[in-house]
């Protein structure tokens, strides 16, 4: 059997493919201006680095291209640890910032439902307005703020009490005894301020007469913490011709954004 040589037409095609591939490699290395092209083994090194500069687009944000100074620093093993220390010092504050707990700015679940308190009491010689607001701090503590304005003669007292507090006009010796529930009442006055002003004005019951009136404005801040069960608002007003004692215990199982309204 006589063997015939293969046609030479195939060889130029193979050579053309090889030249095309080599051109692609050379074109890929043209963008790497920070590499020494005259050094030996440059082609292999450039091919490896070209993969780093042109990675697969697996991330939305493109990886930053290393600066020339970074690679030159890393080439020397003596200066590598200094370079790594400098990079670490820059990245440590960012890492600490990322480790901080994220504070949610949205609404968190309150410990109880009621938030605002409003009480308006009007008589012939008295006009009393009491407003209250509770602020849940979200860390197991909450504050209760009271403000009341009264026009007339008398003393007003607004406080937080446990449910066992007896509603009565006069303080009896039995009501001062400490119970188990009152001992676990973890609420205290944090701030208190009272402003009083005296003036004369026309009487409500008889506009032809001049009456002596006293205006009182009070701000009280309570701070409560766990453990606690139920707290109540206790209002007491004493004047010459009018007495009022009221205890309001909100329902903790009912969550509502509307304020509690009390009138009398």
Curated annotation (Swiss-Prot):
Signal peptide: 1-22
Summary of the function given for this chain in its UniProt record: May be signaling molecules that resemble neuropeptides and that act by binding to alpha-neurexins and possibly other receptors.
Region annotation (IV (linker domain)) ranges: 170-178
Region (V (Cys-rich)): 179-264
The protein's name: Neurexophilin-2
Family assignment from sequence similarity: Belongs to the neurexophilin family.
GO molecular-function term, one example from the UniProt record: signaling receptor binding
Primary location class: secreted
Location relative to the cell: Secreted
Region (III): 91-169
Tissue expression summary: Brain, only in a scattered subpopulation of neurons that probably represent inhibitory interneurons.
Record region (II): 23-90
Organism: Bos taurus
Glycosylated residue positions: 86, 139, 149, 155
InterPro entries tied to this protein: Nxph (IPR010450), NXPH/NXPE (IPR026845)
UniProtKB keywords: Glycoprotein, Secreted, Signal
Keyword DNA-binding assigned: no
GO cellular component: extracellular region
Free-text description of this protein's post-translational modifications in UniProt: May be proteolytically processed at the boundary between the N-terminal non-conserved and the central conserved domain in neuron-like cells.
């Amino acid at each position: 059997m006589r063997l015939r040589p293969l046609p030479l037409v195939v060889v130029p095609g193979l050579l053309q493919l090889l030249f095309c591939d080599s051109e692609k490699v050379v074109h890929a290395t043209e963008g790497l201006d920070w590499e020494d092209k005259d050094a030996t083994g440059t082609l292999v090194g450039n091919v490896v680095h070209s993969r780093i500069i042109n990675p697969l687009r697996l991330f939305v944000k493109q990886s930053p291209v290393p600066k020339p100074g970074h690679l030159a620093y890393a080439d020397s093993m003596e200066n590598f640890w200094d370079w790594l220390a400098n990079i670490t010092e820059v990245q440590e504050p960012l890492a600490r910032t990322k480790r901080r707990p994220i504070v949610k700015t949205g609404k968190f679940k309150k410990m109880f439902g009621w938030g605002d308190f409003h009480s308006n009491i009007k008589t012939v010689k008295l006009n009393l307005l009491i407003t209250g607001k509770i602020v849940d701090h979200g860390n197991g503590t909450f504050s209760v703020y009271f403000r009341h304005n009264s026009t007339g003669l008398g003393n007003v007292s607004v406080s937080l009490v446990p449910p066992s507090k007896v509603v009565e006009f006069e303080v009896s010796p039995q009501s001062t005894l400490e119970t188990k529930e009152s001992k676990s009442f973890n609420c205290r006055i944090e701030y208190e301020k009272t402003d009083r002003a005296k003036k004369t004005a026309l009487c409500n019951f008889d506009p032809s007469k001049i009456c002596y009136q006293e205006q009182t404005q009070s701000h009280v801040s309570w701070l409560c913490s766990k453990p606690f069960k139920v707290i109540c608002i206790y209002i007491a007003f004493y004047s010459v011709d009018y007495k009022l004692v009221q205890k309001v215990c909100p329902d903790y199982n009912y969550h509502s954004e509307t304020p509690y309204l009390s009138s009398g």
